[in-house]
């Protein structure tokens, strides 16, 4: 190693860290075969569950109904409701179709499936189940 390389290492260690000695090798090394055998395969982090916590549908009680405005290129008032799920969690759900008669304290079935133009709305009310009626034909 030349003097210029040593001085460059000393210069970077002075500016980057508290050590006055030049760093000649990396402090973080790869695991040896013995360490990998002893520790086993690396643990994967658990999959993040959605608002239904891995279930296809959940029952919930309507707390209030309201309208939300969609994101930029779309313009409408989307009908939504705040629901207390059977897991104890509260969530905002989209009510599909035209017209609904949902009121406070009614029981609904919700399923996963976000509404693309409503930020934060990740659940959809199932029409025709419990207190939420079918969409009326014209």
Curated annotation (Swiss-Prot):
It comes from Homo sapiens (Human). It comes from the Eukaryota. GO terms for cellular component: mitochondrial inner membrane; mitochondrial ribosome; mitochondrial small ribosomal subunit; mitochondrion; ribosome. It is found in: Mitochondrion. Belongs to the universal ribosomal protein uS12 family. The gene is MRPS12. Residues 36-56 are annotated as: Disordered. Keywords: Mitochondrion, Ribonucleoprotein, Ribosomal protein, Transit peptide. The keyword Ribosomal protein applies. Component of the mitochondrial small ribosomal subunit (mt-SSU). Mature mammalian 55S mitochondrial ribosomes consist of a small (28S) and a large (39S) subunit. The 28S small subunit contains a 12S ribosomal RNA (12S mt-rRNA) and 30 different proteins. The 39S large subunit contains a 16S rRNA (16S mt-rRNA), a copy of mitochondrial valine transfer RNA (mt-tRNA(Val)), which plays an integral structural role, and 52 different proteins. Residues 1-29 form a transit peptide. This is Small ribosomal subunit protein uS12m. InterPro entries: NA-bd_OB-fold (IPR012340), Ribosomal_uS12 (IPR006032), Ribosomal_uS12_bac (IPR005679). GO terms for biological process: mitochondrial translation; translation. One of its GO terms (molecular function) is structural constituent of ribosome. Signal peptide: none annotated. The keyword Ribosomal protein applies.
């Amino acid at each position: 190693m030349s003097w210029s390389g040593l001085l460059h290492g000393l210069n970077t260690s002075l500016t980057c860290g508290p050590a006055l000695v030049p760093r000649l090798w990396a402090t973080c090394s790869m695991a040896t075969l013995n360490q990998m055998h002893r520790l086993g395969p690396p643990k994967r982090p658990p999959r993040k569950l959605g608002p239904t916590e891995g279930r296809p549908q959940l029952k919930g009680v309507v707390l209030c109904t309201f309208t939300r405005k969609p994101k930029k290129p779309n313009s409408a008032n989307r009908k939504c409701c705040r629901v207390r799920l059977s897991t104890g969690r509260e969530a905002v759900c989209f009510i599909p179709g035209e017209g609904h008669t949902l009121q406070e304290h009614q029981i609904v079935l919700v399923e996963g499936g976000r509404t693309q133009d409503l930020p934060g709305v990740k659940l959809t009310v199932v029409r025709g189940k419990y207190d939420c009626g079918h969409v009326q034909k014209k």
